[in-house]
UniProtKB/Swiss-Prot annotation:
InterPro entries: Smg. This is Protein Smg homolog. Belongs to the Smg family. Coiled coil: none annotated. It comes from the Bacteria.
Length: 159
């Protein structure tokens, strides 16, 4: 499923095409099948994207009410999916104001909905990009994250 999300993100978002301008879901499914993806994985990926859009538009309490200086305690399931490096990176992004609390929670929600048992740091970065791209008012954060990803120098974790 993650491969499909990456394919869509790279072919539509990175090429500045509006995902909403896709002709229809059936045509997209056909395109993805022609690209070699399995139908079950295609459906999972499209559902994942739909849930991301729902999060953006929802009034979920965990997305609306938070203490300004609260500390995130991860559940055992979240810690299994997000290793120490990934959790540290999320904290780093919050500290430099790339992620706010709401965006962080959206990222964690989307990570937990992936059918991957664990994620690499690079996978997490792509999920963050997808969330920031889809979240209203996060254009500057998206640009910062994009710059961090594509301007990284080998051997340097942070600039």
């Amino acid at each position: 499923m993650f491969d499909i999300l990456m394919y869509l993100f790279e072919n539509y978002v990175q090429n500045d095409l509006e995902v909403d301008m896709l002709v229809d879901e059936d045509q997209l499914k056909k395109e993805l099948a022609l690209a070699g993806f399995r139908q079950t994985e295609i459906i999972k990926a499209l559902n994942w994207l739909e849930h991301l859009a729902d999060l953006r538009d929802s009034e979920q309490p965990y997305l609306c009410h938070h203490e300004q200086h609260s500390f995130r305690v991860y559940t055992p399931e979240e810690m299994e999916r997000l290793d120490v490096e990934c959790r540290g990176f999320l904290m780093f992004l919050e500290q430099i104001k790339v992620l706010n609390v709401e965006a962080r929670e959206m990222v964690i929600d989307r990570v937990m909905d992936l059918d991957e048992s664990s994620l690499t740091l690079d996978d997490l970065k792509w999920v963050i990009m997808m969330v920031l791209f889809n979240a209203p008012g996060q254009e500057m954060a998206y640009n910062q994250m994009e710059n961090m990803m594509f301007d990284e120098q080998p051997g340097r974790l942070h600039s």
